[in-house]
Amino acid sequence: MNNTGYSRFLQEQWPQQQPLVARYMLAGEQVWLKRAGPRHGMWRYRLLGAAAGVLRLPVLRPVPNLGGRSAIATELRRLRTLGALGLRVPQVLAACDDAFLMRDLGTPGRPTPSLGDEIEAAVAAGPTAVLALWRLGLQTLDAVHGHQQCLSQAFARNLVRCPDGA
């Protein structure tokens, strides 16, 4: 599929899509469409920030995510920056103010588990298996930080293991 096809699909599909993120098969490849959700109110961030101040735990001070178009723009900017640095991120295929379409990092027809899923599955194999996966996550974060970058939501559930194990 060419860029025009991806853009057309995005423009036709995002207004109809109910979930914020959905998977589709296009011309034999798996893609993800992420659309803007409602803007988030600031009161939760202010409450957590106040609690962090009272407890003198600056690590709990939240980084506001305003949601909506702002969140889409931020995510697009981060994906493009990380990709330009050679870090493995999904390729953005098409984008507009309200949504974007990205290529799946996996192989069509095969599952691409998150690091969180793999850690959960490894629990039965014991702590050595879990620790190896946990260290893989730390190595990934170290690689990102080595480029003077950061991930805003570096949870194991958001880190994807590609078919080549990376």
Could you describe each region identified by the protein language model?
Residues 3-12:
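Conserved N-terminal boundary motif of the eukaryotic protein kinase catalytic domain
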Residues 11-12, 16-111, 146, 151:
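Conserved ATP-binding subdomain of kinase catalytic cores across diverse folds
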Residues 52-57, 114-118, 132-134, 166:
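Short amphipathic alpha-helical segments, especially helix-boundary/capping motifs
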Residues 62-65, 123-127:
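Active-site oxyanion-binding pockets that recognize sulfate/phosphate
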Residues 111-125:
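AlphaC helix of the protein kinase catalytic domain
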Residues 128-140:
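Conserved alphaE helix
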Residues 150-166:
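Catalytic activation segment of kinase domains across protein kinase-like and atypical kinase folds
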